[in-house]
Amino acid sequence: MAAIAPAWPLDSLVASSPYWGLREQSFSQAADTLRLVADSPLHLPRGEYLAAWRRGEISAAALETALSETGWTGGAQAWLDAEPRDVDPVPPPRLLAACHREAAGPLSAQSWTDVVIQQISQYCAAWFDRDQANWHLDHERGFYAAWLEQMRHPYGLSALPERREQLRLRAERLPGDAEAMLAAGLAQLQAEPEWLKPWLQALLMRNNGWAAWCAYLGWQAGLKGETDGHLRQLLAIQMAWECLLDDGARGPDSAWAAWHRDWGLRLHGRADPRTLIWQRAHELSLHAPLAQALCRESAAEDGTRPAMQAVFCIDVRSEPLRRALEQTVPASRTYGFAGFFGLPLAYRVPGSDVAQPRLPVLLAPGWEASAAPASKPSAARRGWRAFQRSPLSGFALVESAGLAKLAALAGRSKARGRQAALPQLDPWLTPDSAKPVPRDGLGLERRAEIVSGLLPAMGLAGALAPWVLLVGHASHVSNNPQAAALQCGACGGHGGHQHVRLLAGWLNDPALRERLAALGRAIPADTVFLPALHLTHSDEILLLDADTLSADARARLPGLQAQLRAASALARRRRAPLVGLAPEADDAILLNKMRQKGDDWAETRPEWGLAGNALFIAAPRAKTRKLDLGGRAFLHEYDWRADPDGKGLQAILAAPMVVAHWINMQYFASTADPRRFGSGNKLLHNVVGGRIGVFEGNSGDLRIGLAWQSVHDGQRLRHAPLRLAACIDAPPDRLAEALAAQPVPRQLAENGWLHLYCVHGDTPLRWHADGGWRHD
């Protein structure tokens, strides 16, 4: 069960690696495992690589290197000449349900596999729903026991009239306890020890979406030091279905015998090794030249005081805007840091009883912050919301209130033809709203301790500019249940505005500055920290809390705003072709159209999110400032000379790099296997349980991952599934020490889930599976 990775709910939908539970295996071993248990590829179809080769996207040098890593010595041309014309791979073994030739009934087009997936999925949707319907299943008996009770009633199999009574009688004989069911199922079905573990994993992968949701519940429980049994009970339900379909026949022509033969004969099938070589060559074609270019660049900064400094999130969408800002304002410097700005907070929305974690999902909140409370909804409004959630509201709501919504619908539709307004990211995000304030007694000393560590970690240890912008990011989209996937992942799938408001408020506090000066981190009197928000759908920079500035700072503000507008215009012009707009158009037109994309109900691609991500670079900005990284790189500020004990490097490897790896693998999986790890067609999404996830249509498994429109433009892929290249500027021995202290990052590097490069010397070094550095 540890192989099942969690998937987060819609209101905190962060990118996560669906392969996280397989990280103890090498990448190639995991490819074999996924093929065995789910018929899931860890690569694109081979034809995609051949097309990339013909287009020149895969270089001959990269293919030679990829072949040499496998021990091939015959040269690339001989390998290409041996390319088989027709590939007919042996299919993976089936589950028992798939071995029944009989469909669900003589008049049904469904297979038994479809029936099992549908029944379990609909039951899970009803069981886990807390926010959508007013009627809920009785939870007193437990997840498995309630499912079994449903199966023992005639209505539990209403979609299977031809088999209902037979299955109901078999359900009567199943154990009422999940653990007893698992034991009884193993005894009845007699799975061989050799393939028991992958078979159990295959059972869970049959409803992979709901298994991932159960794994999420277990993850959340683990953060609290607790346990959750839903995933194990889901396994019991899956095994119970296998037992329900087992007719007891054990002859050579029985379904049971076919199932046993399948697993015995196909257990050791492998993923296509040639395609994995193409996959590696595709990665090397980007990674190797970039690593070499980084080694050529100097990390030295001049010592002059910059006119402006701006700290952005490491999100790949920040890189083009940072480059535009530096080109527009040459005396500026930009930095990259995790978008929660080192503040591990949970944020309580006004009027809510729940504090939302707004930090990387790898971490637990350290404290809570909130803004001024909003007025509570009236009784009438609460009653109206309850009516909207009632089982019959889907019909009655349209009949009784449809016309009342007509004017609003017409207004929204008409507004798409005019200049769209800035997104209202939070109802309380207004100049006169209260700042988020720590509620757990976080005093001056604790704030000073936090800030004194954050400033050098962000690269702000030297001379501070008159303006220091702390730039979070957010996106604005309409009619998209997966909108949180476009927000800041480091903020738990929310905008980063509250973090930068909080931190800027601290850094502008005279009392805190006085304490920092005593600690040896004096801030110049004319330095102003200004919170800002990068709107990724339109590449605008929205300044926050400018009304609180001093008169002197407000007098300087128009000049800053003009510089930011110019940088945004340059970034928009460069991004325009990617979203189907003409780069030569007037900036006012581009801005309006990009805003409209975010406000358009029918727009399936308001922005490309993190599509294209392939690089993580931890180095001084001087190392990358001259490079056009094409919006594909997570850029984290790091200067090894300011990190004598290596703790900063360890923290980068353990958190930001792992988060970047998760994002990279989310996009990888949704592209390489959209059937299993993507959420399908965005136009067909229906929300499940208010916040749990989506169905594609109204049937099938819970869909996880990204919609197809997030990685494909209708003509071609917009994301190439390449494993992350993590490029670190630090001496190789220092980097090796940090890896030794962080087992998870080392595991990812040695098992090939990411490629770790040291770009400190004249030529790059890559960390290999044997635990050492080598030249590629």
UniProtKB/Swiss-Prot annotation:
Primary location: membrane
Pfam families: DabA (PF10070)
Annotated organism of origin: Chromobacterium violaceum (strain ATCC 12472 / DSM 30191 / JCM 1249 / CCUG 213 / NBRC 12614 / NCIMB 9131 / NCTC 9757 / MK)
Family statement: Belongs to the inorganic carbon transporter (TC 9.A.2) DabA family.
Subunit note: Forms a complex with DabB.
Location of the protein in the cell: Cell inner membrane
Residues that bind Zn(2+): C313, D315, H473, C488
Protein name: Probable inorganic carbon transporter subunit DabA
Cofactor dependence: Zn(2+)
InterPro entries assigned: DabA
The keyword Transport is annotated on this UniProt entry: yes
Gene Ontology MF terms: zinc ion binding
GO cellular component, one term: plasma membrane
Functional summary from the UniProt entry: Part of an energy-coupled inorganic carbon pump.
Membrane topology qualifier: Peripheral membrane protein
Keywords, alphabetical: Cell inner membrane, Cell membrane, Membrane, Metal-binding, Transport, Zinc
Highest taxon listed in the record's lineage: Bacteria
